Amino acid sequence: FGETLEGAAEAIWQYNKGIVDATYDLIPAVKPQIAMYEQFGIPGLIAYKKTVDYCKSKDLVVIGDIKRGDIGSTSAAYAVGHLGQVQVGSRKYAGFDEDFATVNPYLGTDGIKPFVDVCKEEKKGIFILVKTSNPSSGEFQDRLIDGRPLYELVGEKVAEWGSECMGDSYSYVGAVVGATYPEQGEIL
């Protein structure tokens, strides 16, 4: 392949395959970060899809770290593309076919409901960003609104969205709470 996008993507795929082969019997899940693949364009996305499919073939749960969130129609397309099935003529196909995806709640219910709907239909799940572990997360997530940090309010919305789609005693909707903030995690 040489020094090409295809070459980089193939190297990533082979690396991932090696890691999965060495660990699949020791771990329950993987969480590939799609941006690391997207930077290599279409070849990178092909490597992402191959990685997802290979992990699923090894019975691993795949959490697509995609952090999507947009207006309703765009979120619906993201939800179908990552967790659902897209209609092509008379047939339906799974796009990336992850088991779970990470979602950004910043656009509100418009951006979350399409994911919740697909989760209910496909019996898959989402993890919504509530209190993340990145160093600058507090710039917005810790802002007080009526004396309460924003992350608490987001956590309440996650619980509300999650109560609408229960499956097998668990909700299809979960929260991302960074382990670097144990005090906030305990509150949530």
What are these regions (language model features)?
Residues F1-A22:
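N-terminal glycine-rich anion-binding loop in soluble enzyme alpha/beta folds
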Residues T4-A8, K31-L45:
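Glycine-rich, proline-tolerant flexible connector loops at the mouths of alpha/beta enzymes
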Residues V20-I27, V52-S57, V116-E122:
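Acidic (Asp/Glu)-rich catalytic clusters
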Residues V30, D65, A101:
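Conserved, mostly hydrophobic/aromatic
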Residues K49-D70:
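Catalytic PLP-binding core of fold-type I/II PLP enzymes
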Residues D70-G174:
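Conserved anion-binding
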Residues T180-L188:
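A C-terminal functional module that forms or caps the active site or interfaces directly
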